[in-house]
Amino acid sequence: MAFGSFIGRYGGFFRTRTRDNAAVAERTLQGLAQAEEATFAAMATVVEQGCEQQFQHFISNSPWRHEPVVEQIGRDAERLLGGKPTSALIIDESSFVKQGEHSVGVARQWCGRLGKVDNCQVAVFAVLTDGQRHAPVDMRLYLPQRWIEDP
């Protein structure tokens, strides 16, 4: 699905009573897809009218909720990929190496990507496949005990 088609279908999720952030959502997705690093600065260099501060605000402060977007993606994936003899739901974890300690869920824990204990975040992903195509349909960030006890 092209970015324009995606925003046409999902743009309503990025609107509030007073603001329409669909265009910013589209630029953010383009930046994530095109930049070599998933940083706001890198995204701003590869997207026309890209602005690091605007990306930061959209992700961190905009009042849109991600849950309805994820739910709609799940419904669309089920319609396209589900209900076939080859359909399957894959549940797997992935880890993200981190240098600092300020990202939610960061701790010294098993990092599958490195094959050792290191500073990272861990998330569990659900991916729907029909054997040829696949779509992520949900994810949950694992929170180590220290994050639960002292958020």
Feature locations, PLM:
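Conserved, well-structured functional cores that handle cations and Mg-NTP chemistry
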Residues: 1-151
